[in-house]
A protein has these predicted regions:
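Signal for well-folded cores of large energy- and translation-related assemblies
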Residues: 22, 63, 123, 127-131, ...
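Compact, glycine-rich, soluble single-domain proteins
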Residues: 31-83, 94-124, 129, 135
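Residue-level signal for inorganic ion chemistry
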Residues: 58, 89, 153
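Short, active-site-adjacent segments that bind or coordinate small-molecule cofactors and metal centers
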Residues: 135-152
Length: 164
């Protein structure tokens, strides 16, 4: 592994945008589909080159991510340790590239035939690791996501940017 010495566009990779929340919900057409209390809102973008290995890595990283405060106010606890919930929402725009011009390109986003099953496997794996159901949005729908950030704490995890 080497250090990246200049900004680069990464390969088509699975990306998570994780927000620590007091609460969050997702609706479609004014109808609430899912709601959580304290926990994590996770936006998931699947890239064209993603594998089950990428999905496994991110699911494990997500549930072990220590971004909740312990008794000393130090971010030292994971979502399981605080009894938190996880809301997973698909978001292909996490795969946007803005290198050329001002209009985002989504050619790095996996097509639905690839991304939907990967998203579903990711959500199922997170539920398995948490030992509880994981609420979701509606894949491919125009959703409205409401949240109250806690901190705010927002973390970006990329499946191709792993420790060696």
């Amino acid at each position: 592994c080497g250090l990246i010495s200049k900004p680069v566009d990464l390969p088509e990779n699975m990306r998570l945008l994780i927000q620590r929340v007091k609460n969050a919900s997702v609706s479609v057409g004014g109808v609430e589909l899912s709601r959580i209390g304290q926990g994590l809102l996770v936006l998931v973008g699947v890239g064209v080159e993603d594998t089950d290995e990428d999905m496994e890595y991110l699911a494990g990283k997500l549930v072990r991510l220590r971004i909740f405060d312990d008794e000393q106010g130090v971010m030292n606890l994971d979502v399981r340790q605080v009894g938190g919930e996880v809301l997973v929402v698909s978001q292909f725009t996490l795969q946007a590239s803005t290198r050329k011009g001002n209009r985002p390109s989504y050619v790095r986003a996996a097509p639905e035939a690839v991304s939907r099953p990967m998203y579903e496997r990711f959500t199922a794996r997170v539920a398995e690791l948490l030992g509880r159901e994981v609420p979701t949005g509606e894949f491919g729908a125009d959703m409205q996501v409401a949240l109250v950030n806690d901190g705010p704490v927002t973390i970006w995890i990329d499946s191709k940017m792993r420790d060696c």
